[in-house]
Regions:
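N-terminal secretory signal peptides that target proteins for export/translocation
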Residues: 1-24
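N-terminal leader/targeting signatures
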Residues: 25-28, 120
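Periplasmic c-type cytochrome electron-transfer domains
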Residues: 45-480
């Protein structure tokens, strides 16, 4: 789960981690495709254990096909603390990180839980699940209203105060739920997936769980504890509990395994799916835009190579769909984009403060076959600007204490951690694998589907995608 811990500066650092893959245990019982987690407490057992588990590569249906998770431990252990109630309000880590929903949550899944429980499932708690912690939840009708943002966009309310040392002050609040103030802004954010964590360079959207001179393992341990004390309203975890949760999480790799049009994503030499992903090397700074942190090699914009084997495929049906995926991958790697107005790039001294940077999608999504930024590099791509505000989002007016400049934003982002004016609206770029399972997209759930994501970038950066290019990009994103 995301935490409400407030702290930390980001840093660029090297952190290599090794992985070993163990063989899968024998599966004794079959599990039906598409069942929710509560019906997937598998009674299959390896020879050496009586613990229930989910088998590796169990497919879960999603709108684009199906995804699966591979654990380097051989199976997904449902007795881990990740699946235990460690707080006081009934929540568990998997309340907001469900394998059938890409280890996040979706509006569809949340609406199903609401219908089954009348809005009393542990995910529906006022401390951060409701639009306001003061919301009326006395009746089913009241709960449906109170949890409207969670139900419609799959967003959790994160409460963070304006830092005491901030370069700015809050001078106006427009909160449709009547709660937010300088003491606690209401920030509606999507829970990040608790899988593929070996590719992380930054923990949390705003990096508040990324600590200077520490490993990602340390950061995740602190995040797990913050989640229990915050979201689950419990006591601090023991060191052993933290370690077991992090060990469980960092063994997980999730990716799409089947596309409704292209078919199996390992067919004809393709390298889709979580098993291939688990063998992908990573370290902090790999293929960084300013040069690889270990080898010093220049940045390679060809970040994705999963579907290279499908280049040149022709035909109809699944072969035609595979050709579209390969074209989309190439577009992601090579389509020229004139990047402008992006804080963290165009106002970044390391780039020379250029008005325009000629790049591609991979300028920001540079981690090979994962797609996040391989170093801590939060960016403001305009998602929190006032002209993108919807009526269900709070709006904050901030004023620079030195210059008097004002800015309206729905979420100050990284600035609430650092206090820096230039960090307003900056967020990390997430890992791009397993996307099809966990719409909506962006930190605030503002893009309901892949079409909305591509349309946003096309409009925001003036890319000028053709209709065919948009379709090919979407075909590629669906298969990740």
């Amino acid at each position: 789960m995301n935490s409400v811990h407030r702290h930390a500066k980001q840093t660029r650092r090297c952190d290599s981690r090794s992985r070993s893959v163990r063989p899968k245990p024998q599966i004794v019982f079959l599990i039906f495709l598409g069942s929710v987690l509560t019906t997937l407490i598998v009674t299959a057992r390896p020879a050496t254990s009586n613990s229930p588990f989910l088998p590796n590569d169990l497919p879960f249906e999603n709108p684009s096909g199906s995804h699966a998770t591979f654990s380097t431990t051989g199976s997904i252990d449902l007795t881990n603390e990740f699946f235990q109630e460690l707080g006081t309000n009934g929540r568990r880590c998997d309340s907001c990180h469900r394998p059938e929903e890409g280890w996040s949550i979706t509006p569809e899944g949340l609406q199903e839980r609401f219908q089954k429980t009348g809005g009393t499932d542990p995910v529906f708690r006022t401390n951060d699940g409701a639009d306001s912690p003061n919301a009326d939840v006395s009746t089913v009708k009241a709960r449906r209203k109170a949890y409207s943002m969670l139900l419609s966009k799959g967003v959790i309310r994160v409460g963070i105060a304006i830092p005491a040392n901030a370069e700015f002050e809050l001078i106006a609040v427009d909160d449709p739920y009547g709660f937010a103030s300088a003491a606690e802004l209401s920030l509606f954010r999507r829970p990040l997936p608790s899988t593929n964590l070996n590719f992380l360079s930054t923990v949390m959207w705003d990096g508040r769980e990324t600590f200077p001179d520490q490993t990602i393992h340390f950061d995740l341990s602190d995040q797990a504890n913050s989640a229990i004390t915050g979201h689950a309203q419990g006591q601090s975890l023991t060191d052993a509990q933290r370690e077991r949760i992090v060990k469980f999480e960092t063994a997980l790799f999730t990716a799409q395994i089947h596309d409704r049009d292209a078919g199996e994503l390992t067919a004809r030499g393709a390298k889709g799916g979580p098993v291939n992903l688990s063998n992908q090397p990573f370290y902090i700074g790999i293929n960084d835009i300013f040069g690889d942190s270990k080898t010093g090699a220049a940045f390679d914009p060809t970040v994705f190579s999963i579907y290279d084997a499908w280049k040149g495929v022709s035909g109809h049906g699944s072969d035609g769909a595979r050709a579209a995926v390969a074209r989309g991958e190439q577009l992601f790697n090579t389509k020229l984009i004139n990047i402008s107005g992006v804080s963290g790039i165009n106002d970044e001294p390391a780039f020379g403060n250029p008005l325009v940077v000629k790049g591609t999608c991979t300028t920001c999504h540079d981690t090979p076959n994962s797609g996040n930024h391989s170093v801590a590099a939060p960016l403001d791509i305009g998602l929190t600007d006032v002209d993108r505000r919807t009526p269900d989002m709070p709006l904050y007016t901030l004023r620079n204490k030195t210059t008097g400049e004002t800015r309206l934003t729905t979420d100050p982002g990284r600035a609430l951690i650092t206090g820096r004016w230039t960090d307003i609206g900056r967020f990390k770029g997430p890992i791009l694998r397993g996307l099809a399972a966990r719409a909506p997209y962006f930190h605030n759930g503002s893009a309901k589907d892949f079409q909305a994501v591509v349309d946003f970038y096309d409009s925001r950066l003036g890319v000028g995608f053709t209709g065919q290019e948009k379709a090919d990009l979407i075909a590629f994103l669906r298969t990740l």
